[in-house]
């Protein structure tokens, strides 16, 4: 049809000019040129498939390259044989449809046409979603680039769930999606599950594009993972499109963050502002007068804060410590701040009920005190944007929820030095219960601290949930006389293995332990709210997550000695502690060695904080390994 070809050619010219103006290739990409200098792997006959037309991006050979614009629209004049054939194919398609499939080569999750370029062009002009094709898959020759690794993950996904439409830009996403649906990447999925995912994704994609998702730097599949992480209890197929669009608008900043590079996702706030450091308790005029004129809150109009704990405070030392911090706020701020606590909220329904109650009570800030509550906290934050939510974790890139945690590695550095000063045979035990963000930095600073006092020190590393007495016996068999285990216990007289302790004749004798001062931490955060500096922490023009990461210099972390520790030893540790607080000592500055070689050479500045949080190596004097994530999934936050 003459008019159809003219319209298609017009779109082709527009696409060609747009590409030239943006310094892009104006014609179809040809696969032969694309792979000419690349190492290639084997070819695999995939067979007859319906493939997404939006993923058909080029031709196999150069022969037809200049006949089409980069958007697959025709460019040749109307009075040509090419134009007549294109028009005939158009007439066939609109009257009866094609019967024969095109022939394509798949390379890196894109398709290049061997036979049927004009048919593909006609279908794209008609906005058809798919085309029937005989597919040959061409594998890359190496798998060391991000793109090839992502393609390898896609191929593993495709073998169990043959959907081309699902494309991720982050490693590990296919496995995450499979787990969300109760599947894996090893066993073939039931056809009902494949069909469900296809229909769900297409519904979500329409809503995502309607909400303006094509302006974001993520794929629709990336966005669907973010959506499901917040609204994972809802079946998308049963949700009206208008509601999905509305929800996408609510989590828009989460979607923006998902498109950023890892180093651009999180702002680590490592020290409080000057205003936050000022202590109202030291004011001679009293707490109320100290804040007079500095805050909109008063005893008559207090800042109301809720704390949501995972377990009962009577049975969980972690939750009990946080609740002591909550009680400190009530006492410290003299009526300007009023708090309430909700315990045993590990069940999602109980958690959401607690949030609803807190909002009804007028609470403007909600702390959830366990990283395992982050999923629930994120969804609640999206539903109640007028409330400020914080979760006790580190390294999680959520703009709707701020995270807070402490630089425990500083305390572990001191404990490592202390351990080396008291070990009899250069062998020191270290037990970590969970593989978490920050765990490796704590192990490594412990090892570095030990090596400062004893260059021959070896850190015997074990992982997992092991009974304290069984762990002590196992360490004794390894010749370990000094070790560090769990960080918390109700008292130093507790006979279980906690903190740094000696192993003597099968018994435990405490040496020192790390200490959390959650009252101080909550005081610093709340003071930013009272002073009105909360919003100054992050620049609204840059959508980033905010993670508070305070350390010894802020008074939120310290160590406590057992009674009877020699004063010479305490003096040594105090010197190192002063260096940490003053900033003259950084365990991760200068020369660093891992089990695999040199991390950085002498004279180098300290590692950036983001590298410390996401550390993925062990110091050279650590005897042990990092758990395999397939066997023991890494917890993303402490």
Q: Language-model features: where?
A:
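Hydrophobic alpha-helical segments within soluble ligand-binding/sensing domains
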Residues: 404-426, 515-536
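Glycine- and acidic-residue-rich phosphate-binding/metal-coordinating active-site segment common to enzymes
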Residues: 107, 114-177
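An alpha-beta-alpha
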Residues: 326, 414-457, 542-563
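Short, charged/polar connector segments at secondary-structure boundaries
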Residues: 1-118, 124-125, 170-183, 190, ...
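Segments of small-molecule ligand-sensing domains
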Residues: 532-537, 541-638
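Extracytoplasmic "Venus flytrap"
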Residues: 304-324, 329, 342-348, 436-440
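Flexible loop/hinge segments that line or gate small-molecule binding clefts
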Residues: 382-405
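Periplasmic-binding protein-like
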Residues: 362-371, 390-392, 480-489, 508-516, ...
């Amino acid at each position: 049809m003459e008019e159809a070809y003219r319209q298609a050619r017009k779109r082709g010219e527009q696409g060609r000019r747009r590409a030239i103006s943006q310094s892009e290739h104006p014609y179809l990409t040809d696969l032969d040129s694309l792979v000419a200098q690349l190492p290639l792997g084997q070819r695999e006959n995939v067979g007859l498939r319906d493939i997404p037309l939006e993923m058909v991006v080029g031709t196999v050979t150069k022969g037809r390259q200049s006949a089409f614009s980069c958007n697959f629209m025709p460019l040749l004049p109307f009075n040509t044989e090419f134009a007549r054939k294109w028009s005939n194919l158009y007439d066939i398609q609109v009257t009866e449809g094609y019967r024969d499939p095109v022939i394509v080569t798949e390379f890196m999750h894109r398709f290049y046409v061997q036979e049927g370029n004009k048919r593909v062009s006609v279908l794209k002009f008609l906005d058809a979603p798919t085309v029937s094709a005989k597919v040959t898959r061409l594998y890359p020759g190496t798998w060391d680039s991000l793109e090839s690794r992502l393609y390898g993950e896609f191929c593993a996904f495709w073998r169990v769930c043959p959907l081309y439409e699902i494309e991720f830009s982050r490693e590990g996403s296919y496995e995450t999606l499979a787990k969300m649906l109760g599947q894996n990447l090893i066993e073939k999925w039931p056809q009902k599950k494949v069909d469900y995912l296809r229909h769900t994704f297409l519904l979500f994609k329409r809503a995502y594009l309607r909400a303006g998702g094509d302006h974001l730097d993520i794929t629709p599949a990336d966005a669907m993972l973010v959506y499901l992480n917040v609204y994972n209890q809802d079946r998308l197929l049963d949700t009206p499109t208008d509601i999905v669009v509305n929800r996408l608008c609510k989590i828009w900043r989460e979607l923006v963050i998902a498109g950023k590079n890892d180093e651009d996702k999180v702002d680590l706030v490592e020290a409080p502002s000057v205003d936050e450091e000022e202590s109202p308790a030291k004011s001679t005029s009293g707490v109320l007068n100290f804040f007079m004129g500095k805050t909109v809150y008063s005893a008559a109009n207090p800042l109301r804060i809720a704390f949501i704990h995972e377990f009962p405070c009577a049975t969980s030392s972690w939750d009990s410590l946080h609740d002591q911090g909550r009680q400190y706020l009530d006492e410290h701020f003299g009526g300007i701040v009023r708090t309430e606590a909700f315990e045993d909220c590990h069940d999602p329904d109980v958690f959401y009920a607690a949030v609803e109650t807190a909002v009804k009570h007028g609470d403007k800030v909600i702390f959830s005190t366990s990283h395992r509550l982050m999923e629930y906290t994120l969804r609640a934050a999206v539903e109640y944007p007028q409330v400020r939510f914080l979760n006790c974790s580190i390294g999680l890139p959520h703009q709707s929820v701020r995270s807070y945690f402490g630089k425990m590695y500083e305390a572990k550095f001191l404990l490592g030095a202390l351990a080396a000063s008291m070990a009899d045979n250069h062998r020191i035990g270290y037990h970590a219960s969970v593989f978490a963000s920050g765990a490796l930095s704590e192990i490594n600073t412990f090892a570095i601290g030990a090596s400062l006092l004893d260059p021959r020190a070896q850190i015997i590393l074990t992982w997992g949930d092991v009974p304290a007495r069984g762990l002590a016996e196992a360490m004794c068999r390894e010749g370990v006389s000094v070790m560090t285990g769990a960080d918390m216990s109700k008292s130093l007289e507790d006979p279980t293995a906690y903190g740094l302790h000696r192993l003597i004749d099968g018994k435990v004798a405490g040496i020192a332990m790390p200490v959390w001062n959650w009252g101080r931490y909550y005081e610093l955060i709340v003071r930013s709210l009272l002073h009105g500096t909360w919003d100054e922490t992050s620049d609204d023009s840059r959508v980033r997550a905010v993670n508070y990461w305070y350390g010894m210099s802020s008074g939120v972390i310290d160590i406590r000695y057992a009674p009877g520790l020699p004063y010479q030893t305490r003096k040594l540790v105090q010197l190192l502690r002063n260096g940490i607080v003053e900033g003259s000592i950084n365990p991760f500055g200068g020369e660093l060695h891992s089990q695999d070689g040199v991390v950085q050479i002498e004279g180098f500045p300290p590692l950036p904080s983001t590298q410390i949080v996401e550390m993925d190596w062990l110091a050279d004097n650590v005897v042990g390994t990092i758990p395999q994530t397939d066997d023991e999934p890494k917890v993303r936050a402490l």
